[in-house]
């Protein structure tokens, strides 16, 4: 979701969440957007 497997839309989505610094695509087919602090 959130644009994956493209990292950029996922990263932007995560940056919009308070307390999150960004994100990346992970999971079996890089389809899960994972946010990091």
UniProtKB/Swiss-Prot annotation:
GO cellular component, one term: extracellular region
Keyword NAD applies: no
Disulphide bridges, residue numbers: 4-25, 10-33, 14-35
Domain of life of the source: Eukaryota
Chief location bin: secreted
PROSITE patterns: INVERT_DEFENSINS
Signal peptide residues on this chain, from the entry's feature table: none
InterPro entries: Defensin_invertebrate/fungal, Scorpion_toxin-like_sf
One GO biological process term: defense response to bacterium
Subcellular locations according to the entry: Secreted
Gene3D superfamilies (alphabetical): Knottin, scorpion toxin-like (3.30.30.10)
Pfam families: Defensin_2
Keywords: Antibiotic, Antimicrobial, Defensin, Disulfide bond, Secreted
Function: Has antibacterial activity against M.luteus and E.coli.
Family assignment from sequence similarity: Belongs to the invertebrate defensin family. Type 2 subfamily.
Protein name as catalogued: Defensin-A
